[in-house]
A protein has these predicted regions:
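Conserved glycine-rich Rossmann-like NAD(P)H-binding loop of the short-chain dehydrogenase/reductase
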Residues: 30-47
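The beta1-alpha1 cofactor-binding region of Rossmann-like NAD(H)/NADP(H)-dependent oxidoreductases
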Residues: 41-42, 62-74, 102
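Flexible N-terminal pre-Rossmann segment of NAD(P)-dependent oxidoreductases
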Residues: 1-9
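A short, exposed helix-loop element centered on a Lys and neighboring polar residues
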Residues: 120-121
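Conserved NAD(P)H cofactor-binding loop of Rossmann-fold oxidoreductase domains
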Residues: 89-93
Length: 123
């Protein structure tokens, strides 16, 4: 399927595994160039190498934590002129709502709400 993404620049947060890695694969299949961001550098590098080899695209990586303003600043500098942002970083606490402590909820919200807002505003 041609989604007319060839040559587009895509930033994907949380790209090292799961949905983020699957999104990276899908964009690479369409010929998009990728900036892959996550906290786990080894997984990012392996994914980028595989996608570059399989799809002849540019795929750069940056280790980042969206809860840290300095990491967002650094990421935005690397992501100059992106066409598409995929906010995918992080997971949420599992379990019953009455069993999850406030610290776990705050941790998740710092990333999945404020991290997403901050990077979207910065870009």
């Amino acid at each position: 399927m041609d989604l007319h993404l060839r040559g587009k620049r895509v930033l994907i947060t949380g790209a090292s595994k799961g949905i983020g890695a699957a999104a990276a694969e899908a964009f690479a299949e369409e010929g998009a160039h990728l900036l892959l961001a996550a906290r786990s550098g080894d997984q990012l590098k392996a994914l980028a190498e595989r996608l570059r080899s399989a799809h002849q695209i540019d795929a750069a990586t940056i280790v980042t934590d969206l809860r840290k303003p300095e990491d967002i600043t650094r990421l935005v500098k690397e992501a100059a002129d992106i066409d598409i942002l995929v906010n995918n970083a992080g997971d949420i606490p599992g379990g019953s709502i009455d069993k999850i402590d406030e610290a776990a909820w705050r941790h998740a919200w710092e990333l999945k709400v404020f991290g997403y807002i901050n990077i979207t505003r910065a870009i």
